């Protein structure tokens, strides 16, 4: 029991430090290719997924590619969401994972990661981004809390909703860079 309490305290300290770090604005935000960022992060997260019967599809909006982001931080969010999706589909007969982008409101890019896993109980969905809340039998329940901190530090939002075809959809937003801004940057 003492060990579990100790681990919880340690995880809480890690989350607090990350929030402080992000709150101080210590991020390396640059203009990045969203498609490339997503492909690189998902390639790492998808190692072994094919062997588990996961079918992956990509659906990128061709008119939307450049975002203002700290590449490493956002890739950590993608890595976390994709790994969670793969784990959620372990018991599913259909294991479809979709990673895509679409244009959102107010100059935001929307990243969408959907799975056909077991889904999330409605009573848990509202708490999912709180530290130590998890749907897994293992793990600390800090990944989504950290992901929310990262996305909010980028001026975005992260949301969860049921997938109409079964499973879960996570969406997060990042500021898209307009062609005019891109021109001015060069």
In which residue ranges do the predicted regions lie?
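Detector for a conserved hydrophobic position within an alpha-helical segment of the HATPase_c
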Residues: 150-152
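Short alpha-helical Gxxx[C/S/T] motif in the catalytic ATP-binding
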Residues: 143, 147
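Conserved micro-motifs of the catalytic ATP-binding
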Residues: 24-27, 66-69, 135
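Short helix N-cap motif at coil->helix boundaries in the Bergerat
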Residues: 119-127
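Conserved catalytic submotifs in the C-terminal HATPase_c
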Residues: 39, 50, 55-65, 104
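Short beta-strand-loop-beta element adjacent to the nucleotide/active-site pocket used for signaling
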Residues: 95-98, 102-111
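Conserved DHp (HisKA) dimerization/phosphotransfer helix of two-component histidine kinases, i.e.
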Residues: 1-24, 30-48
């Amino acid at each position: 029991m003492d060990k579990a309490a100790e681990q919880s305290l340690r995880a809480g300290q890690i989350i607090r430090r990350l929030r402080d770090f992000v709150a101080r604005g210590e991020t390396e935000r640059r203009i990045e290719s969203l498609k490339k960022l997503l492909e690189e992060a998902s390639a790492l997260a998808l190692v072994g997924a094919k062997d588990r019967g996961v079918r992956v599809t990509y659906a990128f909006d061709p008119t939307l590619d450049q975002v203002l982001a700290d590449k490493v931080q956002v890739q950590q969010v993608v890595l976390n969401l994709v790994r969670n999706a793969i784990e959620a589909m372990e018991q599913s007969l259909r294991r479809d994972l979709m990673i895509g982008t679409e244009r959102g409101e107010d100059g935001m890019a929307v990243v969408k990661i959907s799975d056909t896993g077991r889904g999330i109980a409605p009573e848990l969905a509202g708490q999912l981004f709180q530290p130590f809340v998890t749907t897994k039998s293992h793990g600390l329940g800090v990944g989504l809390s950290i992901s929310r901190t990262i996305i909010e530090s980028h001026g975005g939002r992260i949301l969860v909703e049921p997938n109409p075809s079964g499973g879960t959809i996570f969406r997060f937003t990042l500021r898209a860079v307009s062609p005019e801004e891109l021109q001015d940057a060069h």
